[in-house]
């Protein structure tokens, strides 16, 4: 019997998204997938490097362009569920029609005519009708309104100006509005000023500049480590109780000048109570009890997950800090900021911008995560609980087996 490998928990990914591709040769050809690295995934789909999908491999359709991404997923599983949801709905409808609908059974019997010697005639399989851009907009709209995804801090980032205008025109015709305001970011070729262009301060400038590494919150992680390294007087700003960082999950305010620390449960309860949403289980944002700034809950959880799960990297950072502290104790005239700068220089080596090392974790985990981002809908969820050995990268399609490229 093979040994069962147990995968240790990893930090929450800084960036994970579902994306929509369009062929620049034939605009009716669209493709959906999910990835933690959109720039690398686009290069794979265009055949520059290995690892593309079968349905984007046709040279007559290349190159592909990335039209939009839905970002803000806190796990690979959540992104895959969002990616595969439309295909799963179609599968359930087909199974229901085959098993429980008498009319469908009668129609099947009528269509099965007999030939000579009573041999039944095989019915030809109808090709799936092309899924238009409006159909993808409808799927996106339905998923964002669903109970499961409407409470997540998801954002829509448009890289194509004409696609944003198409979405805007389509959404204006829809009677049902989204349950909560979804942040829309205009990026790439989209204009920077628009009626719904909220969050343009977070523009990447293009898919190739997507911020997908923990280097984006380096200062935040460093500040939290400094605050909690000497927990003699670390208290919760909600319950005023003593905090033991090594034994309790502790949140730190992401504001640079704020030193607020709280118990995880205390702060989450405070945020949920302030939101006054009866069905909310996980907060989206809240007001810091110390500096009173609005802070994003997912950002705080990413920092906390790194601090509590990336043990090896955390120990290396602390060792550097303590070496600097020892040197500082024998050198006079040094200010605290110089110590912070010295540690920052060392941290830059650990927070490199290389996409292969963006999580500061082992390479096998990151490569496996990226290579499995476009697996088939019927197989993807079954393989999540199994630890796969390192094999040659094989990328399959993001949609179901009977789907066809448009």
UniProtKB/Swiss-Prot annotation:
Chain ranges of zinc fingers (SLX1-type): 236-291
- Outline the segment boundaries, as ranges, of region: Disordered: 88-136
Coiled-coil region: none
Give the GO terms filed under biological process for this record.
double-strand break repair via homologous recombination
UniProt-listed Enzyme Commission number(s): 3.1.-.-
* Domain of life according to the entry: Eukaryota
All copies of domain GIY-YIG, residue ranges: 14-98
**InterPro entries in UniProt:** GIY-YIG_endonuc, GIY-YIG_endonuc_sf, Slx1, SLX1_C, SLX1_endonuclease, Znf_RING/FYVE/PHD
Its family?
Belongs to the SLX1 family.
Which proteins does it associate with, and in what oligomeric form? Forms a heterodimer with slx4.
What the protein does? Answer: Catalytic subunit of the slx1-slx4 structure-specific endonuclease that resolves DNA secondary structures generated during DNA repair and recombination. Has endonuclease activity towards branched DNA substrates, introducing single-strand cuts in duplex DNA close to junctions with ss-DNA.
Q: What is this protein called?
A: Structure-specific endonuclease subunit slx1
What organism is listed for this UniProt entry?
A: Neosartorya fischeri (strain ATCC 1020 / DSM 3700 / CBS 544.65 / FGSC A1164 / JCM 1740 / NRRL 181 / WB 181)
State the gene name recorded for this protein.
slx1
